Amino acid sequence: MKPVQKMAEANFKANGMPVGILDANNGDILVQVGWQEICTNFHRVHPVSRQRCIESDTHIASMLKVNEVAEYKCGNGLWDIGIPVIVFDNHIANIFLGQFFFEEEKPDRDFFIDQAQKLGFDTEAYLKALQKVPKFSKMSLGLEIPRISPGPFLVFHKN
């Protein structure tokens, strides 16, 4: 996975979009780059919010079909885009682009304050991490998705 990790790092450096690649069978994280502090230091650490992460990953994975892209707002309030990786008709992994916000929406600060308080997070540190979450316009993602959607380099069929 080292070459794929390097490719993901180059992609993140070029456009700032966090990337994760998860095993389609067991959900193991195979590659991750640019994951947000709010996720790595808060959401994926606390048992309640971590369960939301797992449920969100599982839900978006269930939405994926060959040559389709799915967008989903996770239970912790952030967006992910999922892309299936199909090799010889086997769904082996999912590429997750995110976590991010759409520029067209204003993050619900009260939702995040409430979440921090309910889960016992340091509210100031949590909100500071929230401010670091990147924003992408739907238009810019519309331009990016066709270049990285499951095309010939991700979907291989038996001849």
Q: What function would you assign to each model-found segment?
A:
Residues 26, 86-95:
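A glycine-centered beta-loop-beta connector
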Residues 80-88, 99-100:
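A short, hydrophobic, proline-anchored segment that marks a local hinge/packing element in signaling
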Residues 1-77:
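Structured interaction and signal-relay segments at domain junctions
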Residues 34, 43-47, 85-87, 106-112:
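Surface-exposed beta-strand edges and their flanking turn/coil or helix-capping segments
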